[in-house]
């Protein structure tokens, strides 16, 4: 942990496609909110969810809560556009699912610049690469 990193006691996932949930998240007692554009959003809602989330984050009101945007994998039809949109939202971090190697994070960094990244390692192969990914 760096001097600027604080431990997170509670992190809540909120679907990026649900305006009511995005509004409710402004008052939740948690340290961080992960705004999910991946698993919590059906394929037919993904583009609209990206726009809904952008509006919610532009409106603000999340206080000191860490704001993390979970995008779709870069190997999906939504991933690259999610990454570009997430970078424009200026979150505290972007969460990339299904990271298998450092190359996945390097590809995302090419798109989002210096925004901090969170890596979800979800496969045995990723676990074997954990030291390199970290």
Predicted feature locations:
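Conserved alpha/beta-domain cores
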Residues: 2-134
């Amino acid at each position: 942990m760096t001097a600027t990193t604080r431990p997170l006691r509670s992190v809540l996932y909120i679907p990026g496609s649900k305006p009511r949930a995005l509004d409710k998240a402004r008052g939740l007692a948690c340290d961080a909110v992960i705004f999910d554009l991946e698993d919590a959003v059906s394929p037919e809602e993904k583009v609209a969810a990206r726009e809904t989330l952008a509006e919610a984050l532009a409106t603000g009101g999340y206080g000191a809560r860490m704001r993390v945007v979970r995008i779709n994998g870069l190997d999906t039809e939504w991933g690259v556009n999610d990454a570009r949109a997430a970078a424009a939202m200026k979150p505290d971090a972007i969460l990339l699912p299904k990271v298998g190697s450092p190359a996945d994070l390097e590809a995302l960094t090419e798109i989002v610049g210096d925004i901090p990244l969170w890596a979800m390692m979800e496969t045995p192969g990723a676990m074997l690469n954990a030291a390199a990914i970290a």
